């Protein structure tokens, strides 16, 4: 896919990132992953991120990665575009990016590199190397150890024509506003904070209405309803869902580090689309927490 075509796709609508299915031994389980994608595809997400953050990219091996991307691309062909997660050390990110391109993904989401903090010059070199290793579109994820400044993004935009998107996982409105004012329509902008619905209205007011939804994995109808409420400035629906579901959901999610992923897999299990356990160092929700989440989900009605 042409980078500009990808930019157009991710400039509107709701995005999501399916969890990655594992069996009880923690190995990739293609059968239920296919079933998951087939279930989610018709609900109307503009694109799906395979092996993204919620898809536990950080826990995958180089041998598993191609099978996961190939499964997603083949399952969703003609239904919804697949954007592959890549990240980690520069050379590993490049290897994943090139493999995703070979397998037919429509672009990549570049997650942060591994562990070490780096200055802007090093971050620019890392992102530039990945962008120049492929021809299709790249979205950079500003989060954790990769926090690019407006000036750094301007340099990258000039050097890398296929860098078409910026996903924010920091939540600093001043920084986000500075980036948006400086770069304008050079990028597509995606809200990428955990449980992005909580911040969606604020980001829309800034001029960046697109975000990725984790809860789409288990309450896809509600996720789409909330997105449409934000798009139409339906504050009554937004506030009702924030008050009755998202705030209690946040309280449960925040009980343990890493639950931002674990709670999504738990939700999928509760609604009958079991994705298996998370991989260490993440931990699954405790039984009482599962019951608490089940009550919240049931209150939303059929999906």
Swiss-Prot record:
PANTHER family: 5-DEHYDRO-4-DEOXYGLUCARATE DEHYDRATASE 2-RELATED, DIHYDRODIPICOLINATE SYNTHASE. Keywords: Lyase. GO terms for biological process: D-glucarate catabolic process. The keyword Lyase applies. This is Probable 5-dehydro-4-deoxyglucarate dehydratase. The keyword Electron transport does not apply. It catalyses: 5-dehydro-4-deoxy-D-glucarate + H(+) = 2,5-dioxopentanoate + CO2 + H2O. Pathway: Carbohydrate acid metabolism; D-glucarate degradation; 2,5-dioxopentanoate from D-glucarate: step 2/2. It comes from Polaromonas naphthalenivorans (strain CJ2). It comes from the Bacteria.
